[in-house]
Amino acid sequence: MKTTILLMFLWGLSCALPVARYQNTESKSSEEWKGHLAQTPTPPLESSESSEESKLSSEEQANEDPSDSTESEEVLGLDDQQHVHRPAGGLSRRGGSEGDNKDDDEDESGDDTFGDDDGGPGPEERRSGGDSRLGSDEDSADTTRSREDSTPQGDEGARDTTSESRDLDREDEGNSRPEGGDSTPDSDSEEHWVGGGSEGDSSHGDGSEFDDEGMQSDDPGAYRSERGNSRISDAGLKSTQSKGDDEEQASTQDSHESPAAAYPRRKFFRKSRLPEEDGRGELDDSRTIEVMSDSTENPDSKEAGLGQSREHSKSESRQESEENRSPEDSQDVQDPSSESSQEVDLPSQENSSESQEEALHESRGDNPDNATSHSREHQADSESSEEDVLDKPSDSESTSTEEQADSESHESLRSSEESPESTEEQNSSSQEGAQTQSRSQESPSEEDDGSDSQDSSRSKEDSNSTESVSSSEEEAQTKNTEVESRKLTVDAYHNKPIGDQDDNDCQDGY
């Protein structure tokens, strides 16, 4: 605590005294300072602080009377006695050196104003701090010190004092190095950190404050290891997804030429990725069940259904280009292909009515429900709308999406059937209703679409004819009124009285 308070006081002094650097001090004050340093063999940290205080006070009062310098030396003597009375154990010295390291690192990083405001105390403190904590050879430290001391400082006495204080610091360094051995590894790692290296210790003391929180990004080794762990876990998840994806891809690769073939695979990938965010425990089980059901599934019926749905989507993509020329022919082409694909997909549609309510809410979020509801909305819209050519492609797209969604719901129903519940009874009970529902929804709806579209075209022609008749009647009425008004004006002009010869209405002579 005392060291931190003293350091705060010194920091305030150095901020409050931006005096000129290295002013010429009198030889008398420098000799007295030398005597004080020789009297007090304190540990290196305290000697550096006392020398800093003495230098501050001597710089403060350099321009004043020489009698004031003796007062500053008395103040310095009091400070030195304070330093002597302080306990010089290993703990206090280590705490002081840590605090000194803190100031030193601030000085090096440029946040503090020691080296900038008053150039004297900054390098002096940095020198002594470096002596107390560096385990490097003394010759390099001596060269840096002599280089810093070669700046114009005044009399030769001041240089003698700096050299003697260096000798004292060296002696005390030799004494205090076994005691303060605890602080040397921390300070070494601190210097590495300030120099831009990758040691984990921060610039404050022993580095335990920021080890767990902020300074992890400075350590590239730990960052790489975390990244590698996250990549391994991601690779595990992706491998479980890609298993099911590869099996479905192998079963559907025979009829893969059309561009709509990528759609159910993408959907399956989304299906396995969406619930992963919600509940990973249940979804791993459901994913493995889906993979097993894909391997144990009847491949012939699935390939037949998917192949016909893909041929159906091919024929629809051709029809979209042909429908602008001949909508009635494309309607004839569309109906048998859609009916044949619906006959193949009937068992999957029977299962879909149940899997849309139960299995889909368990294993995946939204896709087939949305697709079937969208397709039903499209069918309802196409029944009520009056535009032929625009409704046919949307209707064919909705049927293809519904068939793909039903095939996928068939897979998810297989996964839900493996959990032995009473789904088979519900299947058998809901088969008849689903058959009638699917037939009444799809195959008659397309025929109704054709008849409705023909009726709508007839009603359009009728409305056009009635509009043309009504417009012609209105034109005839307007013509009749114009003719009548002209007749009236001509009659009025010709039936004038005899005495009225000019063009105005009033008669002449009145």
Curated annotation (Swiss-Prot):
Biased segments, Basic and acidic residues type: 123-180, 273-288, 299-328, 358-367, 407-417, 481-499
Compositionally skewed regions (Polar residues) per UniProt: 333-343
A single MF term (Gene Ontology): extracellular matrix binding
GO cellular component, one term: extracellular matrix
Region described as Disordered: spans on this chain: 23-510
Tissue specificity field: Expressed in fetal brain, bone and tooth particularly in odontoblast, but not in ameloblast. Not expressed in liver and skin.
Disulfides per UniProt: none
Signal peptide: 1-16
Positions annotated as glycosylated: N351, N370, N427, N464
Record motif Cell attachment site, residues: 364-366
Main location: nucleus
Family annotation (Pfam families): DMP1
Origin superkingdom: Eukaryota
Subunit structure: Interacts with importin alpha.
PANTHER family for the chain: DENTIN MATRIX ACIDIC PHOSPHOPROTEIN 1 (PTHR23400:SF0)
Role noted for this protein: May have a dual function during osteoblast differentiation. In the nucleus of undifferentiated osteoblasts, unphosphorylated form acts as a transcriptional component for activation of osteoblast-specific genes like osteocalcin. During the osteoblast to osteocyte transition phase it is phosphorylated and exported into the extracellular matrix, where it regulates nucleation of hydroxyapatite.
Name of the protein described by the UniProt record: Dentin matrix acidic phosphoprotein 1
Species: Bos taurus
Lineage per the UniProt record: Eukaryota, Metazoa, Chordata, Craniata, Vertebrata
Gene this chain is encoded by: DMP1
